[in-house]
Structure formats: C-alpha cells, structure tokens
C-alpha cells in the first residue's frame, strides 16, 4: 500500500518520463537539449508546513453600514458595530518614524445579525453587544483576537435598550414589551428580578407605554432606575422598594434622556423637535420646554420640526453653562437640508452640517463617574459613510484630523495592488508631494482615541497599497507595519478632454457612468513608472518627477479587433492578417473619423475618449507621458484590456485583450507589435485554427440570455469545468483576471454594478468568448454580481478544439530563452492565454543608450508553445539554486530636473540574470507557470517539464503569485471555493490548504492579491480592505486591545458635603438581584449559550505572564495606596477627634461656673 501511495505522489510531483519535453510542454522549433532531472538539481527547500498559518491582521476603511457606537473612557478604545454583525475596535499605534497612524481590529458575530447597541465594561477589557436577533454577547478583549465568552438568547421578547452602570456586574435590558430584565455579567444568566411594564405604570392607565427606549440610574442614588418608554411615559423605579417613586406622562414621544451630574434634573428629547427639562422636586410638568430650531409663527405657534433623536447634557468646571448637544430637530421648511449636529453652550448655538446622515454620536468626558462634573472635551459623530470627531475645547469647534483611512470608498474601489519591501525612499517622496494638497483647519490637539498597544515585530519594511477607483482616481497608501495612511492621489481623468454632450455616445456603449474607471495597475517601484488600464480600453503611462513640467501627452491608437470563423476546419482558407490597415502601427495618433463618413454612421477608427492635444502644465508627482487607446472598428467598441506588463529596463509596455497582443515602445513612442493571438502561433498552433478577414456582421444570439439572468449557486458552479463552455455552439473559456470582465459594468460600489447601454442596432449579446472580456448587456442583480460566479454551463474537453477566440490572460517581461537552441538568456515576453497556452516571444533590444533611442526594437514571435490546463494566470522565474529572479529595471531619474553638467542623466539599468554557478543545470533557469487548474515548473532553455501539480479539480484558481516568505520562495494560490493554497518551489509540494472563505464573491475575486512577506489583501466590503497573512511569523505581530490601566478614583466630595448631602445608604446589587433574594428567572425567557472563546480566552488571558504580572503589580499598588490613604484618614480623624474633645472640655470648664443669665 505504501508503494502505491508513492506511485500516486510521483504522478503529481515528479518530472515527466521524457526529460527533454513532451507534446504537452514541448516546443515547435529547435532541438531539445539535455535537461537535469529533479534529483540532479538538488535544491534545498527550507519552507515547511509549520511556517504557514492563515490569520487576519487588520481591516482598513470605514465600517460598511454602521449601526452602533461605544467608547471606553479609561482604555480610550472606540468600537463601531455594523449591520452585518461586524465590530471594529480602534486602538492606537505610535511609532517615532511613522507619527501616530491609527490601527483597528475587526471581529464578527457568526450569526451576521445587526449590532443594535454596545456597552463597554469600562477598564475591564470586555464588551457587551446587543444584536438584532435578540441576543446579548459578552466579548473578551484581554487577548489578541477578541472572542465571545457568553451569549444570552431572548426567546419571547425583543431587546430595545441596554444600560450597564459603571463598575457594576448587572446589566439592565429593556424590551419591546416594556419590561426590564437584569443580567449578571459574570455568569450571563438572567436574574429573577424583573420590572414588568404593568407594575411600572399606574393601574388606572389603560394603554401600553410602548417599548423601553431609555434606562439609566440616578447619579444621586444608584438604587433609583429611570425608565423611559416610547410613548412619553417616564418612571423612576425604586429598586429596593420595588415600586415607582414618580411617573411622568408626556404628550410627545421620547427618543433619549440625559441626566445632570448632580441628579436633580434631567433632559428629554422628543419627536416634535423639542427638549424638555424636568426637576426632581416637581415632576408634574417640565420646568422648561424649548424648540432649539423652531421659529415662532405669526399665530404664535411653533413651526413643526424633525425629531431630536439623541441629546447629551454635560457640565463643565470652567463654565457655569452646560453643554447641550443633540442631533436632528431642524424645521421642515427646507427640503434636502443636510444632517446636523447642534452644540448649545449657554446662549451660543452652533450648528455643524454633516455630509451624511448621523447614525449615532457620543460625548467624550474626562471622568467615567456620572455623579461628577463631566468635563466634555470631544464629540464622536458616526455617520453613514464617515466618522468625525469634534473638539469641544475650542470655541470654533474644529474637527480632529482622522488618522484612520475613512475615505477608501470616496469613489468605489475597482482594483487593488499590494507592494511589499519597496525602496525606502519612495514613501517619504510620495508623502511630501501629497502633503501639499492636504486640508487645513484641523484641531491642534492629539487624537482622543489613544488606547491599545500594537507590536510589529521585526518586519517593518516599507509597504504600499494602491487602489484604483471608479472615477479614475488612484490612491497610494502607506501600509507599513499594518497601518494605512494616505500618501498621494492621482486623477487619471485629467489626461482626457471632458466629453461634450454629443460625444458621449462613444463611451456610453462601453460604460454608463464611469468612463475613467480603473481596471488594472502596473507599477515599477524602482523606476517609479506607473501604468493604469481604464475601462474605456486605454492605458496611461506616468513618470514621476519632483518638478513641474509643461508637456504634450503623446497618444497612440491601436486597431486590436479581429473576427474568426465559428467553426474552423483544415480545409478553410489560408491565414489572413486581421490588421490590414498599417495606420494602426503609426507612432502618431490618427484623427478621429467623423461618424457621418458612412451612410449608417458607423463609428470606425475613433477612441472612446479624447486625449488633450495641447500643452499641459503638470504639478510635481506622477505626470502623464503616453496614452495608448484601442479604437472602434466597424461600429464595434474595442474589447477591454485583460492584462498588462511593463519593464523599465527594456522601455517596453505590453497589453492584451480577447483579440490579441500589442507591444509598445514607450521610449520611442512607437507600436512594435499588434497581432491577433493566432498570428503569434504561426504554424505552431496546436489547434490549427484560422482567422477570417474581412470582418463579418454579427448577428444577435438570443440563446445567450441565460448567461446572466439565471443566478446559479457557487456550489453547483464549482463542480463544472471553467475551461470551456458551450452555449449555442460558441465556446467560452473563462479566466480569473482581477479586473471586471467585459464592457458591461464597472465593478464594486455600494450602489451595485453599473450596466452598459447598447447603441442602435447592437445585438443584446456579442459572440461568446473568453470570460476575461465577456460582455453581458442585460441587468444583473447585485446579489448575483457579488456572490456568484457565472462560469461554465457545460463541461467538454473537446470544446477547446472548437475555440474561436483566445484571450491573452497574462504577460511578463523577463530575461529568458525564446528557443531551445539559445545558449544565453535574452529579453523575452511570456504570454499566457485563456486556453492554457504559453508563448515565448524573444526580443532584440539595443544595449547602447543612444542606439536605444534611435534604433528599433525587434520583436520576433518564434512559435514556442507550452501547454497547461485552464487559463494561464502567472509566471515566475527561479535560478538553479531556487532563488527568485526579479525582472531587470531602470533606476529612477528625474527627467525634469535641472541639467547638471557634472552628472549627465543617463539610464542606469539593473539586470538579474539567471545564476550560472550551479553545475547541475549549467546556464539555464526554471520557469514557474500557474493556470486555473495546475502549476508546472519548466527548465529553460530545454523547456522540459520538471514538476507538475494539479492544484484543484472541483474549483479553479482565481489569483496566483510567486512570493518570497521567510527568505525562500513559494507559489500562493487563491481558489474560487475560498481555499488558500501554498506550494513549495520548485517541487510544487503542498504546504498549506485552508478553507479561508466559505463563500467568495466577485468583489473578493476582483481585488484579492498576494505580496511578499506572507501577506495578502482583498476588498471585503464596498468600503473596507481586509489584510491577512499566511505566515506564522506575521501572525505574532497582532496587537492587544486591553492594557492594564489604573481606574481613576472618584472625586473627594468633602467631609461636610458627604456627611450632610451624601447618600447614606449603600446599594448592594448582588444582595438585591442575586439568586438568594430574587430567585431564578424562567428558563423559557432566555437561553444561555457558552461562547467558543470562553476556555480559549481564559487560557490566552492566563497565558500572558507579562500582563498578569503587570495587573498583579498594579493591584498591589492600588491596595497599598488605598491602605495608606485609609491610614492617613484614620490618623486625621483621630487627631480631629482629640482636638474636638479638647476644645469641648475647655469650653465645658469655662462655662461650668457661669449662671444662665451670664451667657
């Protein structure tokens, strides 16, 4: 049996029988040369399974659809709950070289129910959440990954409000029926003490008071609980006597209640836009009712106002006037008024307008004790799509500059790129350029949310995240040490003229609202050359400069359209090039042909967008140098670009789509190659397909409507082949590009997908083709777009033989061998297609700088073909020692810098040639090729397949990359079924296979990307970026939310005030609510659910030796300090008592012998 297993393992990880090549991975030209066997290579692989572990590190961006807000005033940690059940907690990070960027932590309720309310156990490292499924959860924050310790599910009542007094172990829970229950925080079990609604109100009252909307204990007496009902009824309940002290019946509905710190009065906000003040001495009627924004009309009545949803009533020592802060309350006189937050301080009223509706707000105060002067210093305002903190200590109420990246979603994110271990000087340069455009007027004080600690370990190399957006903007983010700070913003739309009303039709057929949406990004950090692919089938090349420049942008236009026969047979006509017009190769842009040049007004040889053709002043930063656009051909818009690669050392740019491939020399501004995929094969086409020219008119194919209308579950789709589809006789070969497929929609965004408009006479569907550029013109539901893949509808291997179109799915420039007979590596372009074919195109590039600017670059397709299963996704190159071979690059130089005669500006190139020190393989190197189905390692130049591994049979790979981890190299793959797989190189031995996501959606598939150092990221919601690590070493860099901090002591009230005006009675909640006196609650009322993180959380909390010692030390210090203070107070009282006794004795002796009439 063991021998049989070894044979099976050898079939997947061993080299082929014929080391010189096989029909599946051989070449059509050249003579096979001897290739080493895997044993002869003897590459020592250091990576083991123990080096890998999947772990979420940090989530950036604004929480999607926020619902609740909470703050711990001692730990200074902020928490935001969302509609999807997520919790974002915001600790803070401080680095001397990074300033104080924000870091946040994310946790998720497994039920996915919306978070209605949150309560911190102040300075205890715990959080209570109330969810829409009527469940309470207790979260432990005393560990690196917050976990649920207990849950309590209410079965018969719905939770509406929760209140947890400071330093109390009993939680008050109000319900929709008007009842108030009490929960023990430590055991998470209901107490038998219940305040029923019919006991809270008078017996003579016939109507139900409504749900509980407010609960709070009196600052003057903790034994009194104020209960607010929605109908306007307010009850002060005496917890000891189990009866109501007073009841208030008000005409208007109540939304919130806030106490004065002395406990003598409280304020209510109402649905008519009014604020009512109540005095505890006289509760018959409010002693003050105000309409802050209600004007008095001619008839003397107040105009109607919107409800005041929340009010906060806070006092300050420095001012006799209190702060009254509330949201809402504006009059109905103006439609479309922006949401406001009003701050009333004395007679001054300040109205702050917000960009989005207010979800919740909270006033941050200096003390956690409600019976002390509050001293408010900031207001945290949670909006639907933003997060604002207002400084209350300054008269103009400025806002704080937010260290968290809340504007990731300023425009919907359409693509992402992640670069680790960047050049160290790139981040300061980008920051210095971007800092010039930052807003001013922020508060000068430090950000008030300053809790938590975070460690970054030894890996603090520079990291940059680049996001592309639907409006054509590009954002560069500093992602060093799991932070995210905005560095620089680039607007690609400035390259083009604003389209006129009559010219909108050119891009309207391609995209409805966002003609500048970014599909793909290619960046060379060393040379700082940046390329952007837009949805309107255009590529923009940028160079970085620290100086202003006045330049004219060069524009190149390509006719990359081709039509082929539906069914190809060997008896068809000869190959005919589909680019008969040589003008497509002209280095100068062609003038757009007017639409009236044909009787049918067919658009031809015009781009979707018009590039500015005048002198443009460009500020420092990235400056556009070249624009490459694909043209309309015979009334058909260009196919969108599916892949892109640039190489700064070669000065070349390559792009591909569903029709073919183009290579551009951006130094000489010329087009070197513009061919269909079939023309690249020449006579080496393994399927013997033929092109057809001239193009024929396309007919409507109604049978394709089921491609997008039917929502098919992902589980069914995973069992079908993604490599071929048969729909009405046409073949579709999907790919897994990160960019959106087709011209039908712009991906990503809270508003859902944007659909295309069809021009007159256009068929509802184009011919079936590769999914890299599949066009869908019928409406697709947002759920289908985000949560399912429209992949194969049938499985047939023979359909490949009938494939009529082949998309270029990946490109990469490298120093490699274009032919088997080559003895030295030369510049090559590796091309991968949707049929699993790999073409190697050698190039001849002049080495002298002057010749490079003048002599042409020769590109000669040789017909070299390698084959894999599924669309080709990624290339990687290793030397014979197993080390990664990086692509050559040009060192950055500022082309617009002032001329320096001592330092002539010459191109400085850095080459990484394959190592030839290994005698086992001579001068060759290894090529790693990964497709949707399998991965292969070829030895070059013999093109022998040394290793092959079938990655998946039931699903397909969405994203793959060759990355460096722990000073070694591996192949990382992300599959459509949510699995993350790691394979060793070059042996392709599986090291990790984890089901990370149970169900993936198109947003994740479009934005998921790996990078070096064992990290990856994806867009987990329209507004959030999730970063993960698959490295064990990186998993240890998580921070801690809870830090041991001494709880501030209550203020000393003074001897006389405490003796005469204080609360003489002590309130023991344990005695009142405990099982001994209150009994047990009904089991059918709520169900206790032990949390999975209970035992693990206790172990993790107990396992932190340093934290335990620190807590023990603080506890000892607190105990010793309190004992010392007690001793001092005792001595002081004894001294005072002796003094009092002495004075009393002297007074007695003096007055003893006096008569009564002598006094």
Curated annotation (Swiss-Prot):
Main subcellular location of this protein, as a coarse class: cytoplasm
Pfam families: LLGL, WD40
UniProt keyword terms in alphabetical order: Cell membrane, Coiled coil, Cytoplasm, Exocytosis, Membrane, Protein transport, Repeat, Transport, WD repeat
Keyword Membrane: yes
InterPro entries attached to this UniProt entry: Lethal2_giant, LLGL2, V_SNARE_CC, WD40/YVTN_repeat-like_dom_sf, WD40_repeat_dom_sf, WD40_rpt
GO molecular function: GTPase activator activity; myosin II binding; syntaxin binding
An example Gene Ontology biological process: exocytosis
Residue span, v-SNARE coiled-coil homology domain: 1094-1154
Start-end of each WD repeat: 67-108, 115-154, 159-195, 214-248, 254-286, 307-350, 358-392, 414-491, 519-628, 642-703, 808-865, 874-946, 951-995, 1009-1032
Compositionally biased spans, kind Polar residues: 699-713, 721-739
Disordered as annotated region, ranges: 1-37, 571-604, 690-770
Cellular compartment(s): Cytoplasm; Cell membrane; Membrane
Its membrane topology: Peripheral membrane protein
GO cellular component, one term: plasma membrane
Bias-annotated ranges (Low complexity): 25-37
Family: Belongs to the WD repeat L(2)GL family.
Function: May play a role in vesicle trafficking and exocytosis.
The protein's name in its UniProt record: Syntaxin-binding protein 5-like
């Amino acid at each position: 049996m063991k021998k049989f297993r070894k044979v099976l393992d050898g079939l997947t990880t061993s080299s082929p029988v014929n080391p010189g090549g096989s029909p599946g991975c051989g070449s059509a030209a050249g003579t096979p040369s001897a290739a080493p066997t895997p044993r002869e290579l003897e590459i020592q692989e250091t990576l083991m399974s123990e080096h890998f572990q999947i772990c979420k590190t940090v989530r950036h961006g604004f929480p999607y659809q926020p619902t609740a807000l909470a703050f711990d005033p001692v730990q200074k940690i902020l928490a935001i709950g969302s509609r999807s059940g997520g919790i974002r907690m915001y600790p803070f990070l401080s680095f001397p070289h990074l300033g104080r960027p924000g870091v946040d932590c994310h946790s998720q309720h497994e039920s996915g129910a919306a978070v209605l309310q949150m309560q911190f156990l102040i300075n205890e490292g715990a959080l209570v959440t109330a969810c829409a499924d009527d469940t309470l959860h207790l979260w432990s924050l005393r560990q690196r990954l917050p976990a649920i310790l207990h849950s309590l599910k209410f079965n018969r009542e719905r939770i509406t409000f929760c209140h947890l007094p400071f330093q109390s172990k009993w939680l008050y829970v109000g319900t929709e029926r008007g009842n108030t229950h009490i929960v023990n925080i430590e055991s998470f079990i209901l107490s038998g003490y219940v305040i029923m609604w019919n006991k809270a109100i008078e017996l003579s009252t016939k109507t139900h008071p409504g749900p509980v909307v407010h609960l709070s204990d009196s600052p003057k007496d903790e034994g009194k609980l104020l209960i607010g009902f929605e109908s306007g009824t307010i009850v002060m309940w005496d917890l000891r006597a189990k009866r109501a002290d007073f009841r208030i019946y008000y005409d208007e509905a109540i939304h919130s209640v806030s106490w004065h710190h002395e406990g003598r009065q409280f304020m209510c906000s109402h649905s008519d836009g009014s604020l009512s003040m109540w005095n505890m001495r006289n509760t018959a009627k409010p002693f003050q009712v105000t309409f802050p924004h209600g004007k008095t009309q001619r008839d003397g009545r107040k105009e109607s106002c919107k409800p005041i949803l929340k009010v906060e009533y806070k006092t300050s020592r420095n001012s006799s006037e209190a702060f009254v802060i509330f949201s809402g309350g504006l009059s109905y006189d103006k439609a479309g008024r922006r949401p406001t937050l009003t701050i009333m301080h004395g007679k001054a009223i300040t109205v702050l307008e917000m960009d989005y509706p207010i979800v919740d707000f909270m006033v941050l105060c200096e003390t956690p004790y409600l019976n002390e002067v509050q001293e408010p210093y900031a207001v945290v305002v949670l909006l639907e799509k933003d997060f604002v903190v207002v400084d209350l200590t300054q008269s103009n109420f400025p806002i704080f500059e937010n260290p968290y990246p809340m504007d990731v979603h300023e425009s919907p994110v359409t693509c992402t790129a992640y670069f680790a271990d960047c050049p160290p000087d790139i981040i300061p340069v980008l920051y210095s350029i971007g800092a010039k455009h930052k807003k001013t007027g922020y508060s000068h004080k430090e950000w008030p949310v300053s809790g938590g600690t975070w460690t970054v370990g030894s890996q603090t190399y520079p990291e940059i995240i680049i996001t592309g957006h639907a409006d054509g903007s590009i954002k560069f983010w500093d992602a060093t040490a799991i932070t995210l700070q905005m560095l620089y913003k680039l607007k690609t739309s400035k390259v083009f003229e604003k389209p006129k009303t009559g010219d909108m039709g050119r891009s309207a057929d391609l995209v409805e609202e966002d003609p500048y949406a970014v599909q793909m990004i290619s960046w060379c950090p060393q040379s700082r050359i940046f390329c952007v692919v837009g949805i309107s089938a255009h590529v923009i090349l940028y160079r970085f400069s620290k100086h202003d420049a006045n330049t004219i942008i060069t524009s190149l236009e390509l006719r990359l359209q081709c039509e082929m026969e539906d069914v190809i047979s060997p008896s068809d006509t000869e190959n005919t090039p589909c680019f008969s017009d040589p003008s497509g190769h002209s280095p100068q842009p062609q003038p757009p042909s007017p639409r009236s040049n044909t009787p049918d007004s067919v658009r031809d040889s015009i781009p979707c967008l018009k590039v500015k053709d005048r002198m443009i002043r460009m500020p420092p930063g990235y400056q556009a140098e070249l624009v490459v656009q694909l043209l309309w051909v015979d009334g058909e818009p260009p196919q969108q670009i599916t892949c892109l690669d640039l190489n700064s050392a070669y000065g070349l740019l390559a792009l591909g789509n569903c029709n073919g491939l183009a290579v551009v020399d951006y130094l000489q501004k010329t087009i070197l190659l513009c061919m269909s995929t079939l023309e690249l094969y020449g006579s080496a086409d393994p399927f013997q397909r033929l092109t057809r020219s001239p193009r024929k008119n396309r007919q409507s194919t109604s049978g394709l409507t089921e491609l997008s209308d039917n929502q098919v579950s992902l589980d069914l789709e995973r069992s079908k082949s993604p490599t071929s589809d048969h729909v009405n006789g046409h073949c579709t070969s999907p790919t897994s590009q990160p960019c959106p497929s087709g011209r039908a929609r712009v991906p990503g965004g809270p508003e859902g997908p944007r659909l295309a408009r069809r021009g007159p006479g256009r068929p509802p569907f184009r011919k079936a083709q590769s999914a890299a550029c599949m066009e869908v013109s019928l409406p697709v539901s947002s759920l289908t777009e985000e949560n399912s893949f429209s992949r194969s509808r049938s499985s047939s291997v023979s359909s490949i033989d009938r494939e009529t179109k082949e998309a270029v799915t990946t490109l990469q420039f490298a120093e490699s061998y274009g032919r088997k007979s080559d003895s030295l590596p030369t510049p090559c372009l590796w091309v991968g297609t949707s049929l699993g074919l790999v073409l190697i195109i050698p190039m001849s590039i002049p080495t002298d700088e002057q010749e490079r600017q003048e002599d042409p670059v020769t590109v000669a397709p040789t017909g070299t073909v390698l084959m894999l299963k599924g669309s080709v996704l990624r290339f990687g190159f290793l030397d014979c020692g197993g080390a990664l071979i990086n692509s050559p690059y040009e060192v950055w130089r500022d082309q617009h810098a002032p001329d320096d005669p001592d330092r002539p500006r010459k191109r400085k190139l850095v080459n990484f040639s394959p190592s030839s020190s290994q005698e086992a393989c001579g001068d060759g190197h290894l090529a790693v090729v990964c497709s949707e189905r399998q991965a292969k390692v070829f030895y070059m130049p013999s093109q022998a397949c040394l290793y092959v591994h079938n990655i998946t049979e039931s699903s397909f790979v969405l994203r793959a990359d060759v990355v460096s981890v722990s000073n070694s190299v591996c192949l990382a793959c992300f599959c459509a079924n949510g699995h993350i797989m790691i394979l060793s190189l070059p042996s392709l031995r599986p090291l990790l296979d984890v089901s990370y996501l149970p169900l993936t959606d198109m947003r994740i598939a479009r934005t998921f990307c790996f990078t070096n150092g064992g990290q990856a990221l994806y867009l987990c919601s329209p507004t959030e970026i999730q970063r993960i690590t698959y490295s064990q070493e990186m998993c240890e860099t998580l921070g801690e939310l809870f830090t041991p901090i001494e709880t501030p002591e209550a203020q000393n009230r003074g001897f006389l005030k405490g003796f005469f005006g204080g609360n003489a009675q002590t309130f023991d909640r344990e005695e009142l609510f405990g099982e001994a006196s209150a009994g047990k609650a009904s089991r059918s009322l709520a169900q206790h659910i032990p949390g999975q993180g209970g035992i693990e959380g206790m172990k993790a909390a107990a396992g932190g030796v340093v934290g335990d010692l620190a807590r023990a030390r603080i506890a000892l210090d607190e105990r010793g300090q309190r004992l010392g203070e007690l001793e001092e107070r005792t001595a002081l009282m004894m001294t005072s008592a002796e003094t009092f006794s002495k004075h009393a004795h002297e007074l007695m002796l003096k007055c003893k012998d006096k008569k009564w009439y002598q006094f």
